[in-house]
Design a protein with these regions (language model features):
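A short beta-sheet element
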Residues: 38, 57-121, 143
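Sequence-specific dsDNA recognition surfaces
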Residues: 10-26, 41-70
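A short, polar/charged loop/turn motif at coil->beta-strand junctions and beta-hairpin connectors
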Residues: 3-6, 30-33, 49
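Extracellular/periplasmic catalytic domains that process cell-envelope and extracellular macromolecules
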Residues: 29-30, 95
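Short proline/glycine-enriched turn/loop segments at secondary-structure junctions
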Residues: 26-27, 92, 138-141
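A generic structural signal for short beta-strands and their flanking turns/coil linkers
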Residues: 33, 51, 98-100
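Non-catalytic DNA-recognition/assembly elements of restriction-modification systems
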Residues: 1-20, 149-164
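Glycine-anchored helix-breaking recognition loops at helix->coil/strand junctions
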Residues: 39-40, 78, 97-101, 117-157
């Protein structure tokens, strides 16, 4: 068995961040275009296309800092669906996230996305995220700083592949 090392999530990712709702809110959504991922789309282990919103190229360019790429992990960070986690499906790309969803992008030299997905969805870790999200708040929420501060135990890449 290989050695496991403890890292802060920020040390094994290249991006943690959430987006915004385009100016004009729901009225500005389009019938097709660039996918805008909202919290209702993120279920545990599963992405739901139900109610997927779309924005145009101009709106997407205003959200270029939250461009979703293949293998990104999506984490709901507010409300009753806080701490739900899934991997983005390739079929909905190109995409952006709104302010209720955070992108967690694995640093592939440190951790594989599927291992990170399973780690975040482990029942004990899920319970931990829910505890943090409800701590002293009137609304469940996880901040970027809290997410980046998550302690993640990581084995070798080969062992991660065996686990995932």
């Amino acid at each position: 068995m290989s050695e496991w090392n403890e890292y802060k999530l920020s040390e094994i990712t290249t991006k943690v961040g959430s987006g915004a709702t385009p100016r004009g809110g729901q009225e500005s959504y389009k019938y097709d275009g660039i996918s805008l991922i909202r919290s209702q789309n993120v279920l545990d282990f599963e992405f739901s296309g139900s109610g997927l919103a779309f924005i145009d190229n101009e709106q997407a360019s205003q959200l270029s800092n939250v461009k979703v790429v293949e293998d990104d992990i999506l984490l709901n960070i507010t409300g009753d669906s806080v701490a739900r986690v899934c991997k983005v499906p390739k079929s909905i790309l190109p995409a952006r996230v709104n302010q209720h969803v955070s992108i967690v992008r694995a640093n592939l030299t440190e951790v594989i996305p599927d291992y990170l997905l399973y780690y975040l969805l482990n029942p004990q870790f899920k319970k931990y995220m829910l505890m943090i999200a409800s701590d002293g708040a009137t609304r469940n929420a996880l901040t970027k700083a809290e997410i980046e501060d998550f302690d993640i135990w990581v084995p070798s890449i080969s062992e991660q592949k065996a686990i995932a």
